[in-house]
Amino acid sequence: MAELTIDPASIRKALDDFVSSYKPSDTPTQEVGYVATAGDGIAHVTGLPGCMANELLTFEDGTLGLAFNLDAREIGVVILGDFAGIEEGQEVRRTGEVLSVPVGDGYLGRVVDPLGKPIDGLGEIQNIEGRRILEAQAPDVMHRHPVDEPLSTGLKAIDAMTPIGRGQRQLIIGDRQTGKTAIAIDTIINQKANWESGDPKKQVRCIYVAIGQKGSTIASVKQSLEDAGAMEYTTIVASPAADSAGFKYIAPYTGSAIGQHWMYNGKHVLIVFDDLSKQAEAYRSISLLLRRPPGREAYPGDVFYLHSRLLERCAKVSDDLGGGSMTGLPIVETKANDVSAYIPTNVISITDGQIFLQSDLFNANQRPAVDVGISVSRVGGAAQTKALKKVSGTLKISLAQYRSLESFAMFASDLDAASKAQLTRGAHLTELLKQPQFHPYSPEQEVVSVWTGTHGKLDDLDLKDVLPFEQGLLDYIDHNTDILKTIRETEEFTADTEAALDKAVDEFRSTFVSGSGKPLEEKKVESVKAAPVDQEKIVAGEK
């Protein structure tokens, strides 16, 4: 039998050959964590030491979660969806991805959830053009363009006094049931003419984000848009009241991501957040369940950042990036008309103006119930056509003076002629600004209407005859003159146009029959200027 010998050199050579030819196994490795506790839309997960902030996690039943808190021993996860099937001890796995949604023109006319999945029963969404992360950065200052292009709402009270421009953030604020959603829906419907023009520079794609509303309310909004033919260019992102707090929290970011895709492709977008009060409440509940320190009104300390990083994405980008825009209409609900509460003041400071809807005005049948004194647009005349800017210059100050004089006149027994004329003018202007829902005006119709009111052509009418007179006048001018066409094509209000309008109004007045069945009498419009006051002259040396 041969003697067995050990050759160190052979052993070394064999090991070197093995190491040089070794290839790691192709079997993938994956971190696995476990649910420690779960409930109320929140799960605490142990393990997953490599998890990143805002990373997507998957539970055993396929439900997604968002890594919110990264503590030393566990992760606080916001469950995106139904949490009934998530129990203690179940496995949780990392995805290595952050939250994103599909984007593209396939979303037009569809109703989707905050994850971008269709919920309208019309099948899968086609024509997807990629994905965009929800926490996308807003355009920086050098990539923005000043807001200088009007976005018409079709509402006389807003377009004339608090105009909105493409790329602006205009807050709609007021108590519940004061017509906030109605203004937003009317604005969406008013974009129909631009969409049907086929001009990409005029077309506006609309996104309506419903946060924490009743399912029946969202269905009603969808039906209203369909009846008006506006769903063709509108996307609804729905997170109804029955959804988890996580869905209500991310819904506005989903709508914003869909809109940013169009904005960076040179298109114009209008996005409505209805409403951000519900999103803030959902974020507060998430933060409290995750034991984050509460602050004012129990909101977490970063609730301002919650809304600022969302609304800063609304912008008009420079021509180098395509010249697109995304206009934001955030809605915030107040309690007892208190605009000094935490969330209202936060959003007011972020946005470029606010439209304040007063419940007292709404109950007095002044709709839209815009409070002229506190409503403002920080873009101003830059977001108006030259024609509307010219005729509406005195409208806001006239109404503000009327409000103050009206309260004074309640206690005064005798007023001078100028004050009476100012009260008459203000009452007729207030009546003129009333407008039914789903009845938008074109910009040229608004010019004619506002000019008629500010130049005293309505002052001798009974208040109940103001709106019938206005409608009859617009029909008369449309069928018998080229005034509306001229204003529409030139976007200017020249002296010749004004003279032609003045003549047309006088001609129509001679044919108008009031509600009492009597024709109008020719009356000289009283001036609203103050009458001169006779003062005793004091001559030097007189005794």
UniProtKB/Swiss-Prot annotation:
It comes from the Bacteria. The keyword ATP-binding applies. It is found in: Cell membrane. One of its GO terms (cellular component) is proton-transporting ATP synthase complex. Its main location: membrane. Its EC number is 7.1.2.2. It catalyses: ATP + H2O + 4 H(+)(in) = ADP + phosphate + 5 H(+)(out). One of its GO terms (molecular function) is ATP binding. The keyword Nucleus does not apply. Coiled coil: none annotated. The record marks S375 as: Required for activity. It holds the Pfam family ATP-synt_ab_C. It is a peripheral membrane protein. F-type ATPases have 2 components, CF(1) - the catalytic core - and CF(0) - the membrane proton channel. CF(1) has five subunits: alpha(3), beta(3), gamma(1), delta(1), epsilon(1). CF(0) has three main subunits: a(1), b(2) and c(9-12). The alpha and beta chains form an alternating ring which encloses part of the gamma chain. CF(1) is attached to CF(0) by a central stalk formed by the gamma and epsilon chains, while a peripheral stalk is formed by the delta and b chains. NCBIfam families: atpA, PRK13343.1. This is ATP synthase subunit alpha. It comes from Bifidobacterium longum subsp. infantis (strain ATCC 15697 / DSM 20088 / JCM 1222 / NCTC 11817 / S12). The lineage of its organism: Bacteria, Bacillati, Actinomycetota, Actinomycetes, Bifidobacteriales.
